[in-house]
C-alpha cells in the first residue's frame, strides 16, 4: 500500500523560502540543504525520492541554479563539457557512481511504497553523463563521482572562485 507523502526531513522555513527564491518557484519535493555557501546561502539540496504527490524524483542532489558554480558549469556544458568528460572518465568508475547514487535515493524510499520509483543514477541517467550540474551537486554533497571531480578540476582551472565540498568556498586561484 502506498503512503501519501514520503517521510523525509523537511527544510526549515527559511531554507524553504531561500530555495523557492533561488528556483523561482516552490520546491516540488521535500528537501534538506546539504551544502551552503560561506554566507549560509543554500547551494545543494538533497531531495526526497518522491515529489509530494508521489511522482518519482530522479534528482537526489540538486545544484541550485543561482550559485556561481551553477553558472560556471553552464558555460562548461555550452563549450562541449559533457562530451569532453565522457572521453576522460573511466566508464567503470562512472557506473559505480550511478549505482551508489541510485542506492542512496532508493534507501530513502518510504517503507512499503509500491508506486512508481525513479530509475537510473545521477540525474536519472542510466549510462554516461547527462548533466554536469547533477554530478557536481552529488560530488559537493560527498558522493564519489568522477564527473563531479572533473567539473571541480575545470572550475579550479578556469574560475577564480572554487566551490569545495561541504561549503561553496571562494578561494582565489593564482
What is each model feature region?
Residues 107-174:
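C-terminal charged interaction modules
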Residues 14-21, 92, 103, 107, ...:
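Polar/charged alpha-helical tracts
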Residues 34-87:
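Aromatic- and glycine-enriched beta-alpha-beta binding-site module
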Residues 25, 53-57, 116-124:
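Conserved aromatic-histidine-acidic binding/catalytic patches
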Residues 1-13, 72-73, 79-86, 119, ...:
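Intrinsic low-complexity, intrinsically disordered or marginally ordered coil/linker segments
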Residues 1-47, 53:
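Short N-terminal edge-element motif at the start of the domain
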Residues 68-118:
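An exposed acidic His-Trp-rich patch
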Amino acid at each position: 500500500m502506498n503512503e501519501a507523502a514520503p517521510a523525509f526531513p523537511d527544510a526549515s522555513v527559511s531554507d524553504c523560502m531561500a530555495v523557492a527564491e533561488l528556483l523561482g518557484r516552490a520546491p516540488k519535493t521535500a528537501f534538506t540543504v546539504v551544502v551552503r555557501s560561506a554566507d549560509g546561502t543554500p547551494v545543494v539540496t538533497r531531495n526526497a525520492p518522491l515529489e509530494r504527490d508521489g511522482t518519482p524524483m530522479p534528482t537526489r542532489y540538486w545544484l541550485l541554479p543561482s550559485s556561481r558554480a551553477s553558472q560556471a558549469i553552464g558555460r562548461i556544458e555550452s563549450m562541449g563539457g559533457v562530451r569532453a568528460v565522457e572521453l576522460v572518465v573511466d566508464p567503470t568508475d562512472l557506473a559505480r557512481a550511478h549505482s551508489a547514487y541510485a542506492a542512496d535515493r532508493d534507501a530513502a524510499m518510504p517503507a512499503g511504497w509500491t508506486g512508481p520509483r525513479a530509475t537510473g543514477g545521477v540525474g536519472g541517467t542510466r549510462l554516461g553523463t547527462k548533466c554536469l550540474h547533477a554530478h557536481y551537486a552529488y560530488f559537493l554533497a560527498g558522493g564519489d563521482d568522477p564527473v563531479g571531480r572533473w567539473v571541480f578540476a575545470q572550475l579550479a582551472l578556469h574560475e577564480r572562485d572554487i566551490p569545495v565540498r561541504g561549503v561553496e568556498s571562494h578561494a582565489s586561484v593564482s
